[in-house]
A protein has these predicted regions:
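Active-site-proximal, Lys/Arg-enriched surface segment
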Residues: 39, 67-146, 260-265
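Short, charged amphipathic recognition helices of the HTH superfamily
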Residues: 45-55
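Noncatalytic, typically N-terminal accessory segments of nucleic acid-processing enzymes
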Residues: 10, 25, 52, 62, ...
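Conserved active-site and cofactor/substrate-binding residues in soluble primary-metabolism enzymes
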Residues: 48, 65, 322
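Single, function-defining residue in the core of a domain
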Residues: 1-44, 86, 110, 114, ...
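Short, basic interhelical loop/turn and adjoining N-cap
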Residues: 56-69
Length: 329
């Protein structure tokens, strides 16, 4: 290991020790040691496996005894809630209206698990195959700094693969309500296509939560008591706004309009609905159209926001989410 690697290692260890002290403040010494061991172990092994963390920790005891100690501490009542409360307190002073809350699905693979509660088949995206494990819903806070951005965890929710979709949606909605109370209704939530869901859209609008969802382009557009074909309505839109693209010689041709989204499961004349903005982006490079239309469903709790501002804010919001994903890949 060269000098630069040693310096980096020492720097990371010092930062982790400092963070561990803050997280475990108020706990007894054994619990404080547990927090530090877990943080160092996860960073050192690259995975949240207690057995591998136990092997990584050098505490002059057997791997078996170290594993038992870690298992004992991780079963402590309200441990997850205490950690999340700490993260909320850590983030709260830094949250502004420009903050993005990035909602991202993931998974934890447990390929050798045979009797773990709730464990089931999940798609392991990193290996592109099905394996045993759990579903994970993460919410990250992307905070604007003077010298760039800071990405901090705001919440992490573990699900059994067998959970009913409506139950998972309710857990997410409860989490958003709690965060909006804690963060004084600041920030914008950003979702990928898997969250293009009428119930979620209705919930966000009804609670005055700003959001951007990448649309799938499949839902009908509600106008009065009539529901119209999405693609046909998009073809009628005027692409009169032009913005710089993400690459050289690239330009976005954009259009937006307010649309109605039915929030009831089944269409009817009395079906409930909410109104949001639809932003459609067409990519042009060197004057030629490239790719398919890109749809963003959004609402910034300001019905009087000018169209160009809606477009620019929606694109910039999703661009920042996309940039974070690229870095993690």
């Amino acid at each position: 290991m060269n000098e630069q690697q040693n310096q980096t290692r020492s720097f990371v260890q010092a930062k982790l020790s400092e963070f561990s002290k803050r997280v475990s403040q108020g706990y007894h010494k054994p619990v404080r040691s547990f927090f530090k061991d877990m943080l160092m172990g996860i960073c050192g092994t690259g995975e949240p496996s207690l057995h591998n963390i136990a092997k990584f920790i050098q505490d002059n005891t057997s791997t078996k005894k170290t594993s038992e100690r870690l298992y004992c501490n991780i079963r402590r009542a309200n441990l997850a809630e205490d950690i999340e409360d700490f993260l909320t307190d850590l983030i709260r002073p830094q949250v502004t209206d420009d903050t993005l809350f990035i909602v991202d699905d993931s998974d934890i693979a447990k390929p050798y698990a045979k009797s773990m509660e709730g464990c089931g088949k999940v798609h392991n995206g990193s290996e592109s195959k099905s394996t045993n494990g759990y579903l994970l819903m993460n919410i990250f806070a992307l905070l604007t700094k003077q010298d760039g951005y800071s990405l901090l965890p705001a919440s992490s929710i573990l699900f059994a693969p067998s959970i009913e979709p409506d139950s998972a949606k309710q857990v997410l909605q409860d989490k958003i309500v709690n965060q909006q109370i804690a963060f004084r209704n600041n920030g914008t939530y950003v979702f990928d296509r898997g969250y293009d869901d009428r119930k979620l859209i209705g919930f966000m609008v009804d609670n005055g939560v700003s959001f951007v969802i990448r649309g799938m382009g499949l839902r009908a557009i509600k106008e009065g008591i009539v529901e119209k074909n999405f693609k046909e309505e998009v073809d009628k839109m005027k692409f009169k706004y032009k913005l710089p693209g993400l690459r050289k010689n690239e330009e976005f041709h954009c259009a937006t309009r307010r649309i109605g989204v039915r929030t009831d499961d089944h269409p009817s004349k009395k079906a409930s609905s909410v109104e949001i903005s639809l932003v459609v982006v067409r990519k042009y490079r060197d004057g030629s159209r490239k790719g398919k239309d890109f749809y963003l469903l959004c609402d910034f709790d300001d019905p009087h926001m000018p169209e160009k501002e809606v477009i620019a804010r929606a694109i910039d919001t999703y661009r920042r989410r996309w940039a974070v994903e690229e870095v993690h890949r």
